[in-house]
Amino acid sequence: MKFFHLSMILLLIGGCSAGNRSGEMDNAGLLVPETIDDGVWGTKGYQGLLGIQKEFDVKVYYKEGMKNDASVRQAIDDFEKEDVNLVFGHGSEYSSIFNEVASEHKDMHLVSFNGDATQKNTTSLTFKGYAMGFFGGMTAASQTKTDRLGIIAAFSWQPEVQGFIDGARYQNSEAEVLVDYTGHWDHAEVALERLDGLLDQDVDVVYPAGDGYNVAIIEKLKESGRYAIGYVSDQSDLGESTVLTSTVQHADKLYELIAGKYTAGELESGNLEFDFQDGVISMGEFSPVIPDGFKSEMNQHIKAYVDTGKLPNGKEPPL
């Protein structure tokens, strides 16, 4: 079990007040199921923690490899000894255990992702992924030569999946979208098997909607001369001629936003959703293979969505 005190590694920060008042953050902690060095989801959480350290002048801690309830319980106990009162569990796997232990740590607020927060000191965060998927689908459909697009998602509940399908069909009525699932965010081997099946069916643009395998998928698409839509991070650096654009979830910015709400005494319990309008979702850099006219059109569509809440088809994302 790894337990890191970032203020010792990076910068010794003073000025932390003694005691714990409602709405006042003493120190912050982060739990990640894998590592902060994955370059995608875990790294985003780590960057958010560093942002909190800088913005709010607090000590921050993180633990990696937090995959089971026993390790999570121990980590929260350890955090409490360090006067941590705002804890981020960087994934849906933390929602249930946070609900269970919340009553034992009433002076802490426990924040997770994509779950159901039921206690007064728990909150679950969700990125509203439909719109980003819609814009990703539009972009993919504008560049396909075979009219066959593919999605390799982790789970069927991901709203970006249906968003991608609807966006692709809005842009190109001839487009067919084939969807497959891995059943886990990190099953790279399974995802690559799914990719082989899609490529055998003449799919020429793929949306790997899973942060644990998207890099592997994009690398293989690059080798085969196909296109990708990046996921979670702006993945244009993996190949600007391969990655048409990316659907970017700024977990780092969201963590700073949540820390600000907590400090102001405005962080609500329960389940909260966030979208483009909150500044925590965006589209990544567009590939140079995409015509300037289409880029301009997409930027106008995105701005209109931020301003009005309506997508290019005139509809709002489904609830």
Predicted regions and their residues:
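Hinge/cleft segment of the Venus flytrap/periplasmic-binding protein
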Residues: 264-319
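Hydrophobic alpha-helical segments within soluble ligand-binding/sensing domains
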Residues: 125-147, 248-264
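Bacterial signal peptide processing site
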Residues: 17-20
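C-terminal motif of bacterial Sec signal peptides marking the signal peptidase cleavage site
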Residues: 12-15
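Extracytoplasmic "Venus flytrap"
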Residues: 27-48, 52-55, 61-72, 92-94, ...
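An alpha-beta-alpha
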Residues: 49, 135-175, 179, 271-289
